[in-house]
């Protein structure tokens, strides 16, 4: 089992990214080529849970790595759903704003699941913003022929989450290969994220929009 990294080994900051107060973790040499890591979804998701194992490896390879919390997740802002559209476009704009706010010179993007869809959007809408695009299980739109083949188990598990620890184990199971890290620690971390005001309402709206046709 891979050892748990300590948050003391990372820098932590906030920046205004297209009007969204955005929390992020940073690690790696200041002179290194920048990489922005964009996390996936699911109840209680955030950049730390998604990227804490990858960031030290990338930093040790000489990259300056940034892992941002998407709007409505982690320690980033959770605007009232009545006044904010939790769409993929909002996340695309947040990523572009994050790169601009930190003055990063054409970073590479690594996006997972929901974050993969946002990263693809950045590459399509603002290709001059980034250098390379790497997708890890990136979400996206499905054609009518593809929809019946798509696993409903994952969507049903995410959308039916009831706040219990047992249900969070199901969420982690459906999103991850769980035999190489401490699954209980990940479950507890994601549950602790749900204690922040506005997180659950933001996630419910994100899922409502995603399952209604804007599949990330």
Predicted regions and their residues:
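Structural signature of beta-strand start/N-cap positions in the alpha/beta core
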Residues: 34, 62-64, 105-108, 129-132
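Conserved alpha/beta-hydrolase catalytic His-Asp/Glu region
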Residues: 149, 163-216
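Gly/Ala-rich beta-loop-alpha elbow adjacent to hydrolase catalytic centers
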Residues: 111, 115, 119
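Conserved HGGG/HGGXW glycine-rich cap/lid loop of the alpha/beta-hydrolase fold
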Residues: 20-78
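Catalytic nucleophile serine of serine hydrolases
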Residues: 76, 113, 137
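Active-site loop/oxyanion-hole signature of alpha/beta-hydrolase fold enzymes
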Residues: 17, 52-55, 60, 67-110
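N-terminal cap/lid segment of alpha/beta-hydrolase-fold proteins
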Residues: 2-22
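Flexible "cap/lid" loop of the alpha/beta hydrolase fold
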Residues: 120, 124, 131-168
């Amino acid at each position: 089992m891979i050892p748990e990294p300590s948050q003391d080994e990372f820098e932590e900051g906030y920046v205004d990214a297209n009007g969204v107060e955005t929390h992020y973790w940073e690690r790696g040499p200041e002179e290194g080529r920048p990489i922005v890591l964009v996390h996936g979804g699911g109840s209680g998701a955030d950049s730390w849970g998604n990227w804490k194992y990858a960031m030290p490896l990338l930093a040790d390879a000489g990259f300056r790595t940034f892992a941002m919390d998407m709007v409505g997740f982690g320690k980033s802002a959770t605007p009232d759903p009545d006044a904010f559209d939790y769409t993929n476009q909002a996340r695309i704009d947040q990523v572009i704003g994050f790169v601009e706010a930190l003055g990063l010179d054409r970073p590479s993007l690594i996006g997972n699941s929901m974050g993969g869809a946002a990263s693809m959007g950045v590459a399509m809408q603002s290709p001059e913003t980034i250098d390379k695009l790497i997708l890890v299980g990136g979400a996206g739109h499905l054609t009518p022929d593809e929809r019946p083949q798509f696993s409903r188990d994952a969507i049903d598990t995410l959308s039916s989450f009831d706040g219990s620890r047992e249900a969070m184990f199901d969420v982690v199971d459906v999103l991850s290969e769980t035999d190489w890290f401490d699954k209980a620690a990940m479950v507890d971390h994601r549950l602790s994220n749900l204690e922040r005001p506005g997180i659950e309402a933001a996630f419910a709206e994100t899922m409502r929009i995603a399952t209604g046709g804007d599949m990330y």
